[in-house]
């Protein structure tokens, strides 16, 4: 039984899943919006929100925790410099998922996931 197990497996090994989400969260913060399947976007939202929360905290330990996930120095620096001002008024829900329809090859539901910024 799979009671109380959180997170989707997405038909991948744990190492593949971990590497895929690390790459996806890096791309999300680099480009501020990416196109992916609905299931991946829903799982990515959890990780992205955790990274923004770490960036808002801003201390050295939070930065090191972010480096363990993101692994690109310039993306982490950009996130930690911009996040406190971009997401100052939000306590969570830093991403938005928008449905795009079905992919033509396999009819997988496609979405865009983007960062919601509060800048004026």
Swiss-Prot record:
GO terms for cellular component: cytosolic large ribosomal subunit. GO terms for biological process: translation. InterPro entries: Ribosomal_bL17, Ribosomal_bL17_CS, Ribosomal_bL17_sf. Pfam families: Ribosomal_L17. Keywords: Ribonucleoprotein, Ribosomal protein. One of its GO terms (molecular function) is structural constituent of ribosome. The keyword Ribonucleoprotein applies. Belongs to the bacterial ribosomal protein bL17 family. Part of the 50S ribosomal subunit. Contacts protein L32. This is Large ribosomal subunit protein bL17. It comes from Desulforapulum autotrophicum (strain ATCC 43914 / DSM 3382 / VKM B-1955 / HRM2).
């Amino acid at each position: 039984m799979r009671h109380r197990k959180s997170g989707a497996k997405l038909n991948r090994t744990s190492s593949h899943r971990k590497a895929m989400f690390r790459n996806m969260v890096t791309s999300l913060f680099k480009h501020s919006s990416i196109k992916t399947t609905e299931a991946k976007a829903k799982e990515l939202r959890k990780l992205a929100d955790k990274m923004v929360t770490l960036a808002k905290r801003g201390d050295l330990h939070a930065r090191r925790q972010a480096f363990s996930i993101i692994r690109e120095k310039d993306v982490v620096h950009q996130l930690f410099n911009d996040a406190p001002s971009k997401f100052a008024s939000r306590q969570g829900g830093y991403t938005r998922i928008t449905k795009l329809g079905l992919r033509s090859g396999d009819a997988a539901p496609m979405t865009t996931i983007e960062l919601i910024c509060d800048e004026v």
